[in-house]
Amino acid sequence: MAGHDVQYGKHRTRRSFSRIKEVLDLPNLIEIQTDSFQDFLDSGLKEVFEDVLPISNFTDTMELEFVGYEFKEPKYTLEEARIHDASYSAPIFVTFRLINKETGEIKTQEVFFGDFPIMTEMGTFIINGGERIIVSQLVRSPGVYFNDKVDKNGKVGYGSTVIPNRGAWLELETDSKDIAYTRIDRTRKIPFTTLVRALGFSGDDEIIDIFGDSELVRNTIEKDIHKNQSDSRTDEALKEIYERLRPGEPKTADSSRSLLTARFFDARRYDLAAVGRYKINKKLNIKTRLLNQIIAENLIDSETGEILVEAGTEMTRSVIESIEEQLDGDLNKFVYTPNDYAVVTEPVILQKFKVVSPVDPDRVVTIVGNANPDDKVRALTPADILAEMSYFLNLAEGLGKVDDIDHLGNRRIRAVGELLANQFRIGLARMERNVRERMSVQDNDVLTPQQIINIRPVTAAVKEFFGSSQLSQFMDQHNPLSELSHKRRLSALGPGGLTRDRAGYEVRDVHYTHYGRMCPIETPEGPNIGLINNLSSFGHLNKYGFIQTPYRKVDRVIGRVTNEIVWLTADEEDEFTVAQANSKLNPDGTFAEEIVMGRHQGNNQEFPASQVDFVDVSPKQVVAVATACIPFLENDDSNRALMGANMQRQAVPLIDPKAPYVGTGMEYQAAHDSGAAVIAQHNGKVVFSDAERVEVRREDGSLDVYHITKFRRSNSGTAYNQRTLVKIGDIVEKGDFIADGPSMEKGEMALGQNPIVAYMTWEGYNFEDAVIMSERLVKEDVYTSVHLEEFESETRDTKLGPEEITREVPNVGEEALKDLDEMGIIRIGAEVKEGDILVGKVTPKGEKDLSAEERLLHAIFGDKSREVRDTSLRVPHGGDGIVRDVKIFTRANGDELQSGVNMLVRVYIAQKRKIKVGDKMAGRHGNKGVVSRIVPVEDMPYLPDGTPVDIMLNPLGVPSRMNIGQVMELHLGMAARNLGIHIATPVFDGATSEDLWETVREAGMDSDAKTVLYDGRTGEPFDNRVSVGVMYMIKLHHMVDDKLHARSVGPYSLVTQQPLGGKAQFGGQRFGEMEVWALEAYGASNVLQEILTYKSDDVNGRLKAYEAITKGKPIPKPGVPESFRVLVKELQSLGLDMRVLDEDDNEVELRDLDEGEDDDVMHVDDLEKAREKQAQETQDIAESTEDN
């Protein structure tokens, strides 16, 4: 027997074909959401408060300090929040201290700071009753970046940019004349020496002393001449910078100093964030810049005076490591004191080294480092600016390297916590202005924190973020996999990110640093390709928001692969060589071969085993969860795998789902972490179990109660239904499944079914990927799903009186009211069809249209039907089904309703949708198709043992698409069915062709895995043997019931009077310009005329035509289309005297819209009236015949 048995949870064993020992379990798959939010609660929120506070008033006599905060219990439980359309949020109370500096008086007070949405255990938020997800954003990391560009003459120039988290950009660039310029905040450029002089180093010699002598420096100094001798060089430089930043304003050195300080050196206005400081220190660090350079001076220890490194030594990694302590200490540190006119007058500490130029051995190049400012310094320092300039000048000398902006070391993730902190900061900053004004205006003695704090800006910022940010998305709830994928999604779009139109190929492309961090496969097709990605299965965020991936460390001394796990970011990995997970190892962990396949930076090649630093932990660490669910992924073309991964997320939960015979072993973990199942929180014993709740007695005697959700409507309209897995007496451990969620079976993800599939053509019905299906799949409800639709009706107060929910609906027969209760609301369990009343509702209508006689009769007989209009909630087109639930919300019951609403009724209708022609099906390899015919079981081809085939697919769908994985799955699936086992074939480590054939033999199948197939209609065998097997097929969310739509008459657009478009508006089919050409080509003038008139916007014509058709009379000639009248009116509005004349030169009168017509209704009413009139006439005729 090939393979070995592996247990997945307590309910499933699979035969696995994996050969690689996994040394690390998958992390919790939604930790990117939950950990980030937890960090926000633990420290992020506190940091935001500490950033903005304390706040002082303008005279500095009062100060408001932050003390701490506390979350109280949420107002609603999760379930109550869903039912009441509320948010699941907890009130936050913040303690402030108000200090009066004149009297020394301190007032401490707790202030309510609004309700803050809380993340559920599943990593989602409930906002206004809907489940939402905050998608993590992929953005450019703050830091310093260097780039090169080639001009039109082929000359290489360099550029550099310091990008903060918030604040002004500082750029450097060279031009074609070899002069270096700087730009502050995207303004006009100035020589870079001008900025150096503004920092207090004004002499030319001083500048050359700092940066060393080079052509770029000399050229720039020559360009930067002293124009105004009355000013010092520093003052002149400051004025020049001020002129660039504030053109047209009077320039003084003092205003320039304060402006530059505010732009770069004030921590409140300029923030690099922790990650920006880390990146700058890493880039400008002397150690990395000296690596592999030849030192041009003796390095002398300042304390002992000994020579650490002699001039002429190559600074290899080992040399640098030997003097690492001194490099981090005071080695070659110089203190430069700026002059008194400088922006920042504190001394500047720089680390300076001289190295031999790599281009010209006779030249010496100076390298200036920023002497590693402390991590807490979040603003820029003069040392940073000088070190950046030095790196930039060194690039022209052939030292240092330019940055690749698409490298994942330069892109980071802003997860939920950080996005929320940023929103909160925005709200607090708005509040700060408000607080400062109130502190200054009001009387100091009576002020309390409560009085001066207005929380509205903060709550508004948070509310706006959750409600309308591009990154706050309605959860994709088609199935557990789509939930999981959505929580792990990384978007480069959104505020502060890219835009679809500006993103080029480079940003979207797969980069070598994606390995183990972002999935190269799973991304949407279309305009967002490559901008929306998914976290790889082992991906994890570090404290700076860079994605790390785990590797097994290699002990290079003994050449053994250890089980020690090291998590590396992309730029850390660049320094090492990493071997693949399938490298052959001896039992003691040493490499079995001298040469192994590995990766170093962007190169995939063979390396000597002795050079390898790390080994991948798992073959599936490259791909995301959805991709890791595709068996035989290694045999599929990547474009089809992309479709396969995306289509699994569109699978509809079926009534009786089955886990795949051929899985990848990922199904258990995906189901477990998705949040859709019920998982045991503690060890214990089941003491009660039914379909709605399970009780578990813990070992310490306390009782855990788990509620099972039955048939709740999911965000996408499918049934969210959980099924209990345990029975009384079962022992459960923490993490065990208590109940399966939707699309799960026995604790594994089960998106579809395992039908018997044959690759063969049949009467041409599977042309172009169409799917032929057996009637068995319809009759036995194999692909049947339940869909729940929600309809609501509310009663409001109108000008003419309140609306009313009632059973007494005017002009409706008793038959239409048979399923309504005494209130006029449909009973639960009623079967409803299109047009049936769900909630009877009447709205008062004005009496302006009554004549005097009618009013008199009305007053005498009290005819109620005249006063009200029927506005009942009816079942829309395609909405028929069974009423599953009715919820009634009223103020009397204490429900919160919108202002003006007195009562709200929600009706849930369940539909059982069997698979039918036009539904979309797919396998897991991107092989998708539409059901084209459902064939009776007796007509389907059958196997030699009489088993009829379930599905027939076109064999032509395989070769050109190169997704051979489906054929391998087919054969292995048949073997698994015959053997009665389930199989796991993990990606890149699954069943080989030898394993496949061995399992086929074991299952007693023919040696070519094909079979003779008999025609169900004739009983004759087909000419050739056919590939028949079991393939996992899923039914997708694109169902024909949602798309098919037909209209006779319906709503019309107000201005053009043409039918609306689309199913949602019950619209017509657009007969466009090209379709008109087709009719013109055949001279079909009558058809063309009716399309442009009756069927479109000839208002009177269509009314008359309708009447003529219903009465059986000939159809009258058409009139003038409304859009022609609109054209005439538009031309008249331009002041043109436009008239329409007939052939006798008489003016044609166009009907006017405002001739007593009700123009606030789309003109369905005219047709409705005609219809009612017709019905009335028919009824009168029927009655008169009865009387006779």
Curated annotation (Swiss-Prot):
The keyword Nucleotidyltransferase applies. GO terms for biological process: DNA-templated transcription. Gene3D superfamilies: 2.40.50.100, 2.40.50.150, 3.90.1100.10, DNA-directed RNA polymerase, beta subunit, external 1 domain, DNA-directed RNA polymerase, subunit 2, domain 6, RNA polymerase alpha subunit dimerisation domain, RNA polymerase Rpb2, domain 2. Keywords: DNA-directed RNA polymerase, Nucleotidyltransferase, Transcription, Transferase. CDD domains: RNA_pol_B_RPB2 (cd00653). It comes from the Bacteria. InterPro entries: DNA-dir_RNA_pol_bsu_ext_1_sf (IPR042107), DNA-dir_RNA_pol_bsu_external_1 (IPR019462), DNA-dir_RNA_pol_su2 (IPR015712), DNA-dir_RNAP_su2_dom (IPR007120), DNA-dir_RNAP_su2_hyb_sf (IPR037033), RNA_pol_bsu_bac (IPR010243), RNA_pol_bsu_CS (IPR007121), RNA_pol_bsu_protrusion (IPR007644). It catalyses: RNA(n) + a ribonucleoside 5'-triphosphate = RNA(n+1) + diphosphate. One of its GO terms (molecular function) is DNA binding. It is an enzyme of class 2 (transferase). Belongs to the RNA polymerase beta chain family. The RNAP catalytic core consists of 2 alpha, 1 beta, 1 beta' and 1 omega subunit. When a sigma factor is associated with the core the holoenzyme is formed, which can initiate transcription. This is DNA-directed RNA polymerase subunit beta. It comes from Streptococcus equi subsp. zooepidemicus (strain MGCS10565). The gene is rpoB.
